[in-house]
Amino acid sequence: MNNFLVKVASTIEKFNMANKSERLLVCLSGGADSVTLLLCLYELGYDVCACHVNHHLRGEESDRDQHFCEKLCEKLGVELKVFHADVVGYCKEHSVSTEEGARKLRYDFFDSIGADKICTAHSLSDCLETAIFNLARGTGLKGICGIPPVRGNIIRPLINCTRQEIEGFLKERGQDFVTDSTNLTDDYTRNKICLLYTSDAAD
């Protein structure tokens, strides 16, 4: 078994995340992290299905991501459920930010599917970003701890994996993924902090 797969399998076992009798829902955006998560759980023999949320916030790019996920799941023979979210309308009605509204709609959709576990592709790199984000907001020690491996029925099998390891896994398999252009801008607070940190770390 590939070293990366061993690491993911060990994380699942260490935190008692899931067993082979459970139905696991992979939240699939088409990005490197979620594609890796789907492939890992599939190759490890878990009963997986996937879901994709088209937020319709990035024009053709949103549709590109959806089509990519559809083709990937078709190739693997994995069931995919697609949800079209009216983020703009929801945010206007409930007076919340785009990020907050999109997140609420996503998780409501995930819950509605009724899988045993919801699998998100948060990585060790995301934990670092979250800790920096929380520090910047002035939160205490709890905030610095970042993202928990398990929260209720939500599990994060890639939580001990770095972005470099994830991209290496995909490169080894010749597996493509999509890139969200908003991750390359500073339109959102989290992205802005991440870009600033990455820029500082590279100096």
Roles of regions detected by a PLM:
Residues 1-195:
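Core alpha/beta nucleotide-donor-binding catalytic domains of modification enzymes
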Residues 197-203:
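Conserved small/polar residues in nucleotide/adenosyl-binding loops
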